[in-house]
Each structure stands twice: as structure tokens, then as C-alpha cells.
Amino acid sequence: MLAYLPDTHAPAWATVLTEEEAHNQGKALVLGWHEGRLSLWPPMGRETPVAVDFLQGALGYRISQGRVKHERLVKAMGRLPNNSLIVDATAGLGRDSALLAAAGFEVLMLEANPVLQQLLSDGLLRLQGQLPLRLITGRAEDILPQLTPQVVYLDPMFPERKKSAAVKKELAWLQYIAPIPSHGEEANLLKIARRAATHKVVVKRPANAPFLGAETPNSQLPGKAVRFDVYLPIS
């Protein structure tokens, strides 16, 4: 479903094609360079490519001084000790991680998908340390037991229908490379996260979505489109 363009450092397992070849062979997406950023887009399509850019565009506006403190995600973290570490165990494109880092938290991103890992790494390279963001590549289920963060943040992919056309497009692209986790996988990740966190686990969910892993949270920050479910640690 995915092809790497020849100008990328493609891993050994990847299919390397030109954009025209990818289109002719029915590949859904290509990974390549667009305007100096490693990006994802449909071959020969007109859609805007997806890249990780922590300081530009809509995300750059949201993390600007004086705005980020009003983000509901930041409010969901509550009061935390100084120098608190937040682990974003489902980093994706890193946007929520950037908001938390801009709010003053130390943020460690975990990402298992190799394509998203490359996009995040490129974004971090261009960020040049301007936000306290780090990335560890690998499965959160394997890495979290080795960490003791104050907060673990989870935002598992969810097939929400009431999204804008642009968000639906991006979500569809991501689902080609990172399928939606099963109920059992979600429940297991939540349990591991609650054992790792010292203060809380914060889960982002569509407002009308079921609880992650069918586990009732200890508290909630509701919203019209998105809510944040808060879980206390378990031993």
C-alpha cells in the first residue's frame, strides 16, 4: 500500500518506486521529500502532503505563547510537580506532544510504526531542540514498564465520523500504515500505562466514544467533540 520514493533512505523491507510507478501499481501512498520535509501523500494526487512540523501552520499558532495554556489537553494534565515527565505513548504525528512541550512539560514520544517514526524524526531534526521533545522508537507496551513518568498520555486511533474533510483524509492515510488497535490491544495498553504512571493516565477520546478498554475513568474533562478521561495508577 505504501512506496518509498528513490530520494528517501528507505529501509531494506520497503518498496522503492518513482511516484508515477507507485500510481500505476495502485499504491495508496508514497513517502518522499516535499518542500524540504519528509512527507506522505497519494501518488500523482493533488492533496496536501502530510508532514511533521512542530512550529509552523495551525500547530504553530496553537503553541504560541499565551495560547497553549488554554488548550484543553494542557488543562487535563492538572497540577503536576516541576520537571514532570509526560510520555505520549501513541505519538502519531506528534501534535499533542508539541502542545504539552510548549506548555512546559518534558515530553517523551513513543512510536512503533516505522513510517511515523521517520516523519517524527524529520520533524525533530528541523525543530532543533526548540521544544523539550524526545522520541523513542518501539512498542509502548515494551517501553513503558521501563519508565516512571508522572503522566502517560494515550490517544489511540479511532474511526470517528464527525471530523472535518481534511482530518478524515489524514486519518484515512494513517490507517493505511497504522491500523486501528483492537479492543484487547487498547485494554492491555491502558493497563500497562496505569502501572507505569506515578500520577495519572490521560486518554483522549471522541466525545461519544466508549471508554478505552471498557474501563470507567476516575474523572473526566468533557467537551463537545473530544473528552479527556483520567485514570489513576494501579499496582
Description of each model-found segment:
Residues 185-232:
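Conserved Class I SAM-dependent methyltransferase catalytic core
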Residues 156-189:
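Mobile active-site "lid"/loop adjacent to the S-adenosyl-L-methionine
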Residues 85, 106, 132, 199-200:
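Residues at the starts of beta-strands that form the adenosine-phosphate
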Residues 27, 83, 149-152, 198:
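Local beta-strand N-terminus motif with an aromatic residue
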Residues 1-85, 102, 106-154, 235:
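S-adenosyl-L-methionine
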Residues 86-99, 149-165:
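Conserved proline-anchored active-site loop of SAM-dependent methyltransferases
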